[in-house]
Amino acid sequence: MESATTDIRDSIGSIPDYPKPGIIFRDITPLLQNPDAFRLTINTLKQRYAGQGITQIAAVEARGFIFGSALAYAMGCGVTLLRKPGKLPGKVTRQNYELEYGSDELQMHENALTENDRVLIVDDLLATGGTVVAASQLIKSSGADVVEAAFVVSLPELGGEDKLQQAGVACYTLCQF
């Protein structure tokens, strides 16, 4: 497993001074362009969650859609999209959350999940954790069970893992920067 996570980490790009000076952007594009690295990422996550009765992957907009859809296909379960406002037709359930400078909202279709669902939240990167705490609250409001939140990359210095722990959301990351 350690070898797999090292290979995955090595396939993630680092772009200095993007989107602004002093920031190092962790770019998943090289991982996605490398079929071996992408397959390894999905297979590593699949191994972790095999046999846990996951019925739905809750994929967080937008890059979570990539990993969440591939993982759901590999595991034989469904995908529930967690989107920004105005992106889903029909009736939606909403969860507001605070950002550093303002607020935002996640939405999902009103009847996307039931109390019988065991849900894995999937996103590409864990930074501050605010979006995933909101995702967990949104999922739980449907009566579904959140098994864990899974990420390809974590930036521990931004406190996301601590925030998730405080909110009672277990998390797993493949690699840290």
Curated annotation (Swiss-Prot):
Keywords from the named record: Cytoplasm, Glycosyltransferase, Purine salvage, Transferase
Enzyme class: transferase
Keyword Transmembrane appears in the UniProt entry: no
Enzyme Commission number(s): 2.4.2.7
Gene for this chain: apt
Coiled coil: none
Catalytic activity: AMP + diphosphate = 5-phospho-alpha-D-ribose 1-diphosphate + adenine
Name the UniProt record assigns to this protein: Adenine phosphoribosyltransferase
GO cellular component: cytosol
UniProt similarity note: Belongs to the purine/pyrimidine phosphoribosyltransferase family.
Subunit (UniProt): Homodimer.
Function per UniProt: Catalyzes a salvage reaction resulting in the formation of AMP, that is energically less costly than de novo synthesis.
GO biological process, one term: purine ribonucleoside salvage
Metabolic or biological pathway, per its Swiss-Prot or TrEMBL entry: Purine metabolism; AMP biosynthesis via salvage pathway; AMP from adenine: step 1/1
GO terms for MF: adenine phosphoribosyltransferase activity
Places the protein is found: Cytoplasm
HAMAP family named among the record's database cross-references: Aden_phosphoribosyltr
Transferase in keyword set: yes
UniProt xrefs under InterPro entries: Ade_phspho_trans (IPR005764), Adenine_PRTase (IPR050120), PRibTrfase_dom (IPR000836), PRTase-like (IPR029057)
